[in-house]
Amino acid sequence: MMQQFKFKKNILSGILTSNILASCLLCVISGIAFAEDLILPGVEVRAARLYESSPSFRETSDTASLLSDEPGISLYRAGGVSSLPVIHGLADDRIRIKVDGMDLISSCANHMTPPLSYIDPSNVNNIKVFAGITPVSVGGDSIAGTILVNSAAPEFSQAGQDLLINAQMGTFYRSNNDARGINLSTSVANDKAYMRYTGSTVEANNYKAGGKFKPSGLAAVNASTDRTKDRGHLAGDEVGSSYYKSRNQALAFGVNLDNHLLELKLGWQDIPSQGFVNQRMDMTDNDSQQYNLSYAGQYGWGNLAARAYHERTRHSMQFGDDKLFWYGATGMVAGMPMDTEGKTSGVNVQGDINLSQRDVLRVGTEYQRYRLDDYWRASPPAPAMSPNTFWNVNNGQRDRYDVFAEWEAKWNTQWLSLLGLRSSTVKMNAGNVQGYNVLMYGAAATVFNKSDRSKTDNNVDSTALVRFTPDASQTYEAGYAMKTRSPNVYERFAWANSNTMVMNMNNLYGDGNGYVGNLKLKAETAHTLSATANWRDAVQQDWQLTATPYITYVDDYIDAVACAKVGKVCAARTDGFVNLSLDNQTARLYGVDVSGQMSLFRGGGFGSLSAIGALNYVRGKNLDTGDDLYNIMPLNAKFALEHRLGGWTNTIQTKLVDSKNNVQAMRKELKTAGYGLVNIYSSYEWKYARLDLGVENVFDKFYADPLGGAYLGQGATMGTGVLHGVTVPGIGRSVNVGLTLKY
């Protein structure tokens, strides 16, 4: 199923974590309940909405949070701008994410730079989500689905009219973590050309949980007698390493010639600091540049679209303000500097050919070129970290060549179908590596360097969808998809099992464990069956109910295993965490998403009142071991009441999450208790301004985030100095305010 969310152009990029209309719940549930797009691309039926979503729903720092309340989607919490979306229990590289058509890759051994982190929420105009049954035309090399994020489309003036000038500015403040930010957008256009600038900056301190979850005291104490090298004080409810600072800028230029549009988009990102509460390292710098040239044209035979893009990331990690920096008995080892350089380039061409009034044929080709260098400079005088530079990945290569064809048929007013096939070839390789020194790392490096590192996967995707609309009050959809994903660079090429310290640094999961890759990994293949039923009143204004059950079998699912299972010897640990590798297994996931809305009353002097709700359930199992899959969101539900009167919008929202008892034993995943949260939002909108107010977690409830991972926000995180057993808590009460001005 595909949902699309459009955001009104109020630049305030959202000030409140979910904000007004029941936060993203209302915005996102409306993607199904109120503004449903068909599964079939290019066929769109939009029902009447009870409200129009706006950027005030958005959490300014984290674009992924725009999806946090969408049925079937949850989030792996990471840094303040770097959450990872999860679709039906599958996350990270198992989801294809495109930002303005660019197919981006995270260049980090901890995946601190996911694709959604490269666009600020204030620059997002709409998001499309394809869950499970994904048309081959919207992406391959993924098994969970596709997320398409787009900035605003160009606006041109009418011929003969004056220049069209728009400007917007917003600011916000969140009390819990002292988060503050500002964003700006301005554009100018005539009937042939346009130019737009967007910029934003956000900064926040550590957030506070709804209660104490650890002792108060110094964040980290070094082994020497020099107390000036200790880390500062953290309160018992302060979540260490949850601070962040981010700056984003973008320029867009476009030329419109009759039925042809040529656009150039440039993006810059600067993150000088971002703590990671569930990783042993923190981001100390992230510089990214994006170049994106696209063409779209309409012809007598159909549409043609083409794109060429390039993205470069320079990423640095070190121990941040809340983690021990000075190591060694005399406190002379200055942390563990880590650097990454990633380059992603791509070319896409797609043609939509109108074969007849009934039939559309989509054909296309894609090429993606990815290069990665991941190296750790020596940190003397530590014997284990000198004298050489440690090469974690040297000239990592991942090239993908795809072609696809897709046939969409509108048989009559009731029946639609879609059939698609995609062929994908993924070629990977990496250069020779070395450790800090030969004595401690030479053996593992030699084994890797003598291995055949050139890998080629020939993958096939297929999709079959059908939609039946017997009348205006009901729609039924069903489909099957076979999707494949090749391993990423770190899953295949992370080589070092020499000691716990270096294994700790390769962790894509936030569980605190150490990992080493596996050159023998195969591509994952997922088989998904899904159906959707949607019932509503005939005029699609009073009520809607949508239910989507699904089941997915994954052959060669990449999961954590004991090192010995894949012939590797890894150090034992005494801190409660484990050192692991990866291997292909068989997995099964199944669940159901339910969402709905009802207009309780409308019109008159009391305005309108609506009720909105959603329920999500997913279960994941490793069929080879009988173990549960990692980081599966427990049963959860959201309910909201929204009142509108004139310019006022007022919402009260409740979120309920069941306890997480189905956890993965292999990773020593921690259980979490169930909880309920209450949020209140209010806004007033004038013609050129909007004021937003909100209180989130009204009762300051303490809870553990089910997908938050292990708490590693403070202490000596390099090795075994932090003990296993503490989960990352959710944020406590926060009072939020924001103001938007537009011209």
PLM regions with names:
Residues D270-P272, R312-S316, R371-D373, A378, ...:
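Surface-exposed extracellular loop regions of Gram-negative outer-membrane beta-barrel proteins
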Residues S242-S246, N259-L304, R312-T344, A378, ...:
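Flexible loop and strand-edge segments within Gram-negative outer membrane beta-barrel domains
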Residues Q357, K410-S417, V426, D542-A562, ...:
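Gram-negative outer-membrane beta-barrel transporters
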Residues E36-G160:
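Acidic, small-polar-rich N-terminal luminal/periplasmic segments of exported/outer-membrane proteins
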Residues S175-A204, K214-P272, D287-W301, N354-L361, ...:
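Transmembrane beta-barrel wall of Gram-negative outer-membrane proteins
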